[in-house]
A protein has these predicted regions:
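Conserved SGNH/GDSL esterase-like catalytic core that processes O-acyl groups on lipids
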Residues: 1-43, 64-70
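Extracytoplasmic/secreted envelope proteins and their assembly/folding machinery
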Residues: 8-12, 42-49, 72, 76, ...
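Short, conserved loop/helix-junction motifs that constitute active-site signature segments
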Residues: 17-18, 49-54
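Hydrophobic/aromatic residues located in beta-strands of well-ordered beta-sheets
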Residues: 23, 56-57
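Contiguous hydrophobic segments
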Residues: 34-48, 91-103
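Extracellular serine-dependent O-acyl
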Residues: 57-61, 68-99, 104-144
């Protein structure tokens, strides 16, 4: 959540460790129904964006399955112009829990994000379509907010 990541300096730790050229953030789905979210979460979003600093970034909004209480509005108001991708309004096939997009739907979601980054983001990057059967990461490291 923005609260977990934004109440620590772990994002800055990862920035210093990996020296990324570009940062993608995808948080907020567990905060769709937080009441008074702007008051409760603004400082955490601010802290995360301060830790990213001047590195180009895109914050990918949550894949809403119901109307949220303001998480998308909060992130959009804090992110620099062209750095927030609004996922709300997209149609997703959902897993059995009714909330998480299926793997296939998640892949289509990220395809939409990729097209948007190339054409509309504040920091477009060149992306090549992966060859079928070759669309697997060589290495995956899950970054956790707690030490």
């Amino acid at each position: 959540t923005t609260e977990v990541w934004g109440s620590s300096d772990k994002l800055k730790h990862y920035v210093n460790k990996y020296h990324p050229d570009y940062v993608f953030v995808c948080l907020g789905a567990n905060e769709l129904f937080v009441r008074d979210i702007i008051t409760k979460r603004s400082r955490y979003v601010d802290n995360m964006l301060n830790q990213i600093g001047n590195i180009p970034y895109v914050w990918i909004g949550p894949p809403n399955w119901k109307k949220d209480t303001g998480i998308n509005r909060l992130i959009a108001s804090k992110a620099k112009p062209g750095c927030f991708f609004l996922s709300d309004g997209m149609k997703f096939d959902r897993s059995k829990d009714g909330a998480h997009p299926t793997r296939k739907s998640s892949a289509l979601w990220m395809d939409s994000v990729a097209r948007w980054v190339v054409l509309h983001s504040a920091h477009p990057i060149r992306l090549k379509t992966p060859m079928p059967g070759n669309a697997k990461a060589n290495r995956v490291e899950v970054l956790q907010p707690k030490r």
